[in-house]
């Protein structure tokens, strides 16, 4: 049997919670090497590092660009262990005959939608600040500073109404009796409206929402969709949540809005630059609650994601096309 090598790049959870997945790949395919590579590793160095590997299971970084694909003829499949694929040059991969796949967002929808709701509750109730006070021995000190917001009966705006955005909307609608507004130029209007979601333009959503949650894809048109101009249109003391992509917001403008009190709070599971540096200005603000792109880390979600990328490899072994190909091969 001709063994093929697998590189698992920057997916620290793979094989840890479900060691049988790692064992299965080694038995059915070949050696599996887990690697932690720098986010800024250039394509030439990456091509050299992955010489001799047939399959790559890829986390959120580093980036696979033309410099990689033009120098490495061994890799035949890059399976993204996630929804987004901004770290892979799809045109270059297609031109060089490398399949690129990803996880469809229905696999992650519960985990990410629940994370968005958790961030909203943490921000609106000042959970992180309150917990810190108790741990510091300040149970009775300045509790009035923890004055938060009641979620019931408010208006929630959802930007990006795909599987995850719609699931989050349902949590807010049925869990907190919220009115739901949505902005999504690509939405299936009939399907969205059947869920009791009101589609509207972006300005209306910004103006009328108490809470705004971002679930859009990152494109050149959506980059910095929430900028200083958009923030100025929002309700005073609104709360912004981002579990989509970091660059959907202008983080400098968000920080200014938090400091001025224009924005009551910001909760995010993503950042403009990942991993965030510990001296990132946004981390100096108590009104910002940031988690390290960890929304998918539930046992159910991780198990299903692992199984999907493993099946992509098995398809290739059988001479079949893997599922959810995103680069047009």
Task: Give, region by region, the residue ranges found by the protein language model.
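N-terminal glycine-/charge-rich "phosphate-binding" loop or analogous flexible N-terminal tail
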Residues: 1-53, 181, 190, 317
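Rossmann-like dinucleotide/phosphate-binding beta-alpha-beta segment
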Residues: 18, 144-236
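An anion/phosphate-binding loop that grips the pyrophosphate of nucleotide cofactors and donors
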Residues: 53, 72, 208-209, 237
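Short, well-ordered coil/turn residues at beta-beta hairpins
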Residues: 58-59, 81, 215-218, 243
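Rossmann-fold NAD(P) dinucleotide-binding segment
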Residues: 63-75, 221-240
């Amino acid at each position: 049997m001709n063994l093929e090598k697998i590189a698992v790049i920057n997916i620290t959870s793979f094989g840890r919670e479900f060691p049988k997945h790692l064992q299965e790949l080694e038995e059915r395919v070949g050696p599996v090497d887990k690697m932690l590579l720098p986010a800024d590793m250039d394509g030439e160095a990456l091509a050299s590092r992955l010489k001799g590997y047939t399959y790559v299971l890829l986390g959120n970084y580093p980036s696979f660009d033309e410099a990689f694909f033009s120098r490495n003829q061994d890799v035949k499949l890059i399976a993204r262990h996630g929804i987004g694929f901004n770290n892979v040059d799809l045109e270059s991969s297609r031109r060089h005959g490398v399949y690129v796949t990803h996880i469809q967002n229905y696999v992650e929808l519960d985990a990410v939608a629940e994370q968005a709701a958790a961030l909203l509750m943490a921000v609106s109730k000042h959970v992180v600040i309150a917990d810190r006070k108790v741990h510091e021995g300040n149970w009775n000190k300045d509790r009035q500073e923890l004055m938060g917001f009641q979620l019931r009966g408010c208006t929630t705006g959802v930007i990006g109404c795909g599987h995850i955005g719609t699931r989050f909307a349902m949590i807010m609608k049925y869990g907190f009796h919220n009115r739901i507004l949505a902005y999504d130029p690509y939405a299936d209007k009939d399907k969205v409206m059947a869920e009791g979601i009101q589609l509207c333009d972006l300005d209306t959503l910004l103006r009328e929402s108490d809470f705004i949650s971002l679930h859009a894809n990152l494109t050149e048109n959506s980059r910095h969709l929430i900028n200083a101009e958009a923030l100025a249109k929002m309700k005073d003391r609104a709360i912004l949540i981002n579990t989509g992509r970091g660059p959907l917001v202008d983080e400098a403008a968000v920080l200014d809005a938090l400091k001025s009190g224009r924005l009551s709070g910001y909760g995010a599971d993503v950042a403009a630059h990942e991993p965030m540096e510990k001296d990132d200005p946004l981390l100096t603000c108590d009104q910002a609650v940031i988690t390290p792109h960890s929304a998918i880390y539930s046992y159910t979600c991780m198990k299903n994601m692992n199984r999907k990328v493993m099946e992509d490899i098995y398809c290739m072994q059988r001479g079949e096309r893997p599922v959810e190909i995103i680069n047009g091969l």
